[in-house]
């Protein structure tokens, strides 16, 4: 009998549409001869299942089940979370699933909450001896002078929401008198803002996952953008070249992969994660930018690219991850 898998997408953030595209990718990747897939859409207004005819039926939040039009009650064996942003990337949905006893594909509540808060995550990684960019955090209502920012971090700086992804609300600021404007822009996306030192170098990203007691480290992707930085437009409107495997030395590749593996273990991750880095031009230690616990899974996203470059079959990888969660519940 096939296992019932909920593809949980949507969410409450500006990354709603991106999440739906990831769900489309996963729907094509996951083995439907082995699993019954159900698209579950979460919005602030409703949690519902999208049926084959395009209609929607509500999720029963008591146990995350639903009733089909013919009266059959469907209970899921596992939830594959592909929400980018709240509540699927910040630990809230994971906590709910923990309470009702439903296995899920991604990191647990603590790891998800930690990594979604960029400043807290980088400070934790710094405490573990991992190199991160210097930054100042501001909460709504707090202020910092332009002189303090420039003296502490130099210019340019990145100003971005402390929580969130897809570079929404992010600005690269090159002159001091534009800092406040960038802070206000970031505050439209979150109540906390990070002002982060710019680190020159090559941007790379590394995916990894653990299943059946074995860690799989994927080839690196090098990110080359014609925009000023890897912003939302570059990510989703083709203003970027993504080169997999990255054009770096084997030694540097191993260094980044080892750091990714170490971070996976430090935060207690599960499922697939992706860690973004800057490689300084002097060959010194890579700088961690952020950790992504629900990476994009469209057909052109980094993780599918890296899986293909590793010579793996993405359907088999998905099966491995799903079975690992089902067998370790």
Segments predicted by a language model, with ranges:
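Residue-level detector of anion-binding/catalytic polar loops
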Residues: 36, 103, 131, 192, ...
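ATP-dependent carboxylate activation and anion-phosphoryl transfer catalytic cores
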Residues: 3, 250-329
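Short, flexible, mixed-charge acidic loops at enzyme active sites
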Residues: 52-58, 95, 230-237, 293
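A short glycine-rich, hydrophobically flanked beta-strand micro-motif that places a catalytic Asp/Glu
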Residues: 38-40, 197, 204-205, 270-282
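Phosphate-binding site of ATP-dependent enzymes
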Residues: 174-258, 281-287
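ATP-binding N-terminal substructure of ATP-dependent carboxylate-amine bond-forming enzymes
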Residues: 1-110, 114-116, 120, 139-148, ...
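Active-site nucleotide/adenylate-binding loops and adjacent lid/helix of ATP-dependent enzymes
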Residues: 2-9, 13, 114-202, 257
């Amino acid at each position: 009998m096939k296992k019932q898998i909920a593809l949980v997408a949507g969410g409450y953030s500006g990354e709603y549409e991106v999440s739906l595209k990831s769900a489309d990718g996963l729907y094509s990747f996951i083995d439907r001869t082995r699993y019954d897939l159900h698209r579950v859409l979460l919005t602030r207004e409703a949690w519902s299942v999208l049926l084959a005819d395009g209609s929607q039926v509500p999720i029963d939040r008591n146990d995350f089940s639903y009733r089909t039009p013919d009266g059959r009650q469907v209970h899921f064996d596992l939830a594959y979370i592909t929400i980018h942003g709240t509540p699927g990337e910040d630990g809230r949905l994971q906590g709910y699933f923990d309470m009702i006893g439903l296995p899920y594909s991604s990191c647990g509540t603590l790891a998800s909450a930690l990594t979604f808060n960029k400043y807290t995550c980088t400070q934790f990684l710094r405490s573990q001896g991992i190199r991160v960019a210097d930054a100042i955090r501001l909460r709504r209502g707090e202020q910092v002078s332009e002189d303090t920012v420039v003296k502490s971090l130099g210019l340019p700086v990145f100003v971005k929401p402390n929580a969130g992804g897809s570079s929404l609300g992010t600005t690269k600021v090159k002159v001091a008198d534009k800092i406040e404007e960038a802070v206000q822009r970031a505050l439209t996306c979150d109540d906390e803002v990070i002002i982060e030192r710019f680190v020159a170098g090559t941007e790379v990203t590394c995916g990894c996952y653990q299943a059946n007691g074995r860690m799989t480290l994927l080839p690196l992707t090098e990110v080359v953008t014609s925009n000023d930085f890897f912003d939302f437009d570059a990510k989703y409107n083709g203003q970027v070249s993504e080169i997999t495997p990255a054009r770096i030395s084997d030694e540097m590749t191993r260094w980044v992969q080892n750091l990714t593996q170490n971070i996976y273990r430090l935060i207690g991750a599960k499922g697939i994660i992706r860690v973004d880095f800057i490689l300084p031009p002097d060959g010194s230690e890579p700088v961690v930018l952020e950790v992504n616990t629900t990476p994009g899974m469209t057909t052109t996203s980094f993780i599918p690219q890296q899986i293909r470059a590793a010579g793996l079959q993405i359907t088999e990888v998905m099966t491995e991850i799903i079975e690992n969660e089902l067998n370790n519940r």
